[in-house]
Amino acid sequence: MTDAKYVLCRWGKRLWPAKVLARTETSAKNKKKKEFFLDVQILSLKEKIQVKSSAVEALQKSHIENIAAFLASQNEVPATPLEELTYRRSLRVALDVLNERTSLSPESHPIEDGITLSQKEKTDADVASQVSSAPSPSLLGEDGQAVVAQCASKRRSEYSSKSLLPSSALEDHLRCQVGPKTGLSESGAGDKSQDDSGLQLDHGQESTTKKRQRNLGEKPTRRRRSESGLSKGESVLKSQGQASSCVALASPRPPSQTRDEEPCAGVKGCDWVKSSGNIRPLSASERSRGCPTKRPRLDGGQNPPTRQLGTRTVGAAPCPRSCSGEVTMLCSAGAGDKPEEDPVSSEESTGFKSTHSLLEEEEEEEEEPPRILLYHEPRSFEVGMLVWLKYQKYPFWPAVVKSVRRRDKKASVLFIEGNMNPKGRGITVSLRRLKHFDCKEKHALLDRAKEDFAQAIGWCVSLITDYRVRLGCGSFAGSFLEYYAADISYPVRKSIQQDVLGTRFPQLGKGDPEEPVGDSQLGQWRPCRKVLPDRSRAARDRANQKLVEYIVKAKGAESHLRAILHSRKPSRWLKTFLSSSQCVTCMETYLEDEAQLDEVVEYLQGVCRDMDGQVPERGSGDRIRFILDVLLPEAIICAISAVEAVDYKTAEQKYIRGPTLSYREKEIFDNELLEERNRRRR
């Protein structure tokens, strides 16, 4: 544990991957047990901690996969979003470090000829102990044909990554291995001293060979390595000009062991049998009971045996239950024949080159990141989602899903605008017309919207970004519409609301709220939805009528006005009137109906005539201004206090605030201003 460079330690409440910086040995009571302290640094963080060597584990890829699976199975995030992202980024860095170390390990690179076997490859000792000395293998048979070289795959995947051993080490191994780290140049020497003895295989390996065949079938990565190694071997053979000789790699075995050791002995589909310690090709009758007869070549000969790459073959179908991963090559000419170019071999070499290039492309592909770091676009639409929607002639625009009707496959959405009403109903559209906000076409949709509405779409994106940032840091928890209506979004909303006259938004959702006109069939008449008038103004007028009746008919404010004129009650309105020298051209009257305002002003004029001697000298000179600046506010405040049963201060504050306008009234007023501005520009 103390030799590991990367460990898995507990920090806080989680297991974090860390890098070992230093090791410190401490004295323990028991001298036989040594205790170490490790100074480690959390990956992707600058946090450095000290842990005991007994409390850590060597970092392995399986640890990262188990943690990722555990995080994916959790329904709720145990920490804040920012801490969760930091933790997952640390896991990602740890996984990259492990993959990089695997790619740079000695077993992942080919070993040059002549380099001795590494000490770390002692795992083959139990297999090499079963090997006995024997004559060197031969390359040619009795009939001048090439002999098959069948190499059994090794037990584990790391065996397939070991390099080809030199000739002195061949006696210590059970079989030759052709993989991505194996070269065939050594076996392609073609010494004539090896042309006198038959090919012999190991004893007692038939059962283990079958097991390895199944293992190879379950792991396609081994097949990929074998294919790559075979392609490299072909290139070496061609470079040495051995077009008329066959290369067969096998460990030397005594003849007495060959029959029991033959991997394909007793198995249908093999084209070679053992006879008197040698291997001979099957006859036509014997071959008719085994593998199908080979197709005749165009030049009258027989096709060479198939080259088997794992479970895939090049040029012919594989023999059933044949040794997967073994390499079978046949000479195209005998010892006395003249070497001539084989038209089929050129096709096969082209196939090998294409296969080799495909394998290299597969190995060079970037590794897919873990699931926890990938964004998966949701398949369905939920309430509160941010989407794109195209409305009429305008480009796609961001919107919020307010409600979803699964049975009708429709959703009610609300476009994001500068004067958006979060409580608005929105428009109903088909789910097929919606696109997720983070879809693949997001940048294209943004560019299209910026062509005509650059400032407006920029503000929408800023609003959405601010909402997501506040969700991530935990300063806000809720839907987008709740965020828009809350005070926390005011800084972003203020930037566009202050410039509402200068920012042009598309006229979205102004037509039929059920379906856009773009979906209707040509020439089909669709009834227009009747928009009800705004009732807010009428409700305020009815409430103000009670104030007018209290002032005019009941004369409830007359005693209050006389007390102010006689200076028995203080009045801020009278004090402001006497101290101000400017003429106010616009004032807030609180009463919105002109008839109600005229009725109250006419009554106050009568009060001034009755109290002519009590009106201040300044008020006598400008009686209309005195009535509007002093008597009208005092009369309305007194009426509000009496009708609504509140004190004078509360009634005064309500008068100063003025009437509460609805969202539709503000929208109508803004549209009127825009129309007036456009009319003046023309």
Curated annotation (Swiss-Prot):
Q: Where is the composition biased (Polar residues)?
A: 346-357
Q: Which InterPro entries match?
A: MUM1-like_PWWP, PWP3A_3B_4, PWP3A_3B_4_C, PWP3A_3B_4_N
Identify residues that carry Phosphoserine: 105, 168, 345-346
Entries under Gene3D superfamilies matching the protein: 2.30.30.140, 6.10.300.20
Q: Name one GO molecular function term.
A: nucleosome binding
Q: Where in the cell is it found?
A: Nucleus
Keywords, comma-separated and alphabetical: DNA damage, DNA repair, Nucleus, Phosphoprotein
Could you give the domain comment from the record? Answer: The PWWP domain mediates the interaction with nucleosomes.
What is stated as this protein's family in its record? Belongs to the PWWP3A family.
Assembly notes? Interacts with TP53BP1 (via BRCT domain); the interaction is not dependent on its phosphorylation status. Binds nucleosomes. Interacts with trimethylated 'Lys-36' of histone H3 (H3K36me3) (in vitro).
- Record's protein name: PWWP domain-containing DNA repair factor 3A
